[in-house]
């Protein structure tokens, strides 16, 4: 279940970033500036009454660009569904997590993959 909870945490943080961007919030690409911006939003990212390190959220800014807000919302919901199905015995953990990872990868914007490949050439 640890992998599932880790995936959920990553997706949830990226969904929150995406939601803030949709509201018109702009995040700096400079980490020192971002740290100051993060103080304004840190309560939004609080998890289990703990505020994550700003650097962790800063690193997710680049990854979040590869997903749409709707895809992130759907993937967060899928994590809940997979957890429920595992706990109720509908599916086994290993294949369920594998399928979830495949869903996450399938939502990754192909444009960014092609852009990355062009940088390698």
Residue ranges with predicted function:
Residues 1-121:
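C-terminal alpha-helical interaction modules of replication/initiation AAA+ assemblies
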């Amino acid at each position: 279940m640890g992998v599932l909870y880790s995936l959920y945490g990553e997706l949830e943080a990226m969904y929150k970033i995406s939601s803030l961007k949709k509201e018109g919030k702009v995040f700096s690409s400079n980490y020192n500036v971002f740290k100051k911006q993060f103080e304004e939003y840190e309560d939004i990212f609080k998890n289990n009454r703990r505020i994550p390190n700003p650097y962790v959220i800063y690193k997710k800014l680049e990854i979040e660009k590869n997903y749409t807000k709707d895809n992130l919302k759907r993937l967060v919901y899928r994590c809940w569904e997979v957890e429920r199905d595992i706990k109720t015995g509908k599916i086994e953990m290993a294949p369920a997590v594998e399928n979830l990872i495949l869903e996450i990868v399938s939502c990754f914007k192909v444009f960014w993959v092609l852009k990355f490949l062009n940088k390698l050439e």
